[in-house]
A protein has these predicted regions:
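A conserved structural/catalytic subdomain of Rossmann-like adenosyl-cofactor enzymes
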Residues: 1-192
Length: 192
């Protein structure tokens, strides 16, 4: 039996958590399973199956990933990485690592995909420092928190939002995107 497994799952529905259960089943006791999932699996919509998973396995970490992570694959699903320790019940007295890693230093280049804008190595180093606990905890970026099996496992449930960084321009941009989405939806442009 393997001690480590990493998988990418970008489908819809609760089949993702069933897949995670299968992956963890095949790992040795204490083996580490790392999976990229839609954020809904870590949020409220995945509560029942996730709670069942945590009766048998430990959630070590959950990190929200950049919005355009799978841009090259034409998949628009918001994702997170979840890290599990197999066959060891989740201990509600131990902390789980949560991070909002939405900027990986890559930029979307039309017709070229995501490309490193020169910041990836520094960002990777920062993320490693956060994971191993050598970086100062920042409640707006990452933290460690004790959670129950019935709690959300999504970083956004626990990490604070710094509203001081929002501008009127940000608000206008979101409204314009939403207006365009509504128009395209009403015109049937988004269907099939």
């Amino acid at each position: 039996m393997p001690t480590e497994c990493a998988e990418v799952v970008i489908s819809k529905g609760q089949d993702e958590l069933d897949f995670v259960a299968s992956m963890l089943h095949y790992l040795k006791v204490g083996g580490i399973g790392i999976v990229i999932l839609p954020m809904s699996c870590a949020g409220n919509s995945g509560t029942k199956l996730r709670a069942e998973l945590l009766k048998h396995h430990t959630l070590l970490a959950c990190m929200t990933m950049p919005q355009n992570l799978f841009f090259d694959s034409h998949v628009g699903t918001a994702t997170c990485i979840m890290v599990f320790k197999a066959h060891i019940k989740h201990d509600e007295n131990k902390s789980t690592f949560f991070a909002r890693w939405q900027d990986d230093g890559f930029k979307v280049i039309p017709h070229n995909g995501r490309k490193d804008a020169g910041g990836w190595n520094a960002i990777k180093s920062t993320w490693i420092d956060q994971l191993d606990g050598t970086a100062a905890q920042d409640e707006y970026v990452w933290l460690k928190k004790k959670i129950k099996t019935s709690d959300e496992a999504l970083a956004e449930a626990y990490i604070k939002t710094d509203y001081s960084k929002l501008s009127d321009n940000d608000f206008e941009k979101v409204l314009k995107k939403y207006s365009l989405f509504k128009y395209m939806d009403e015109q049937g442009i988004l269907e099939g």
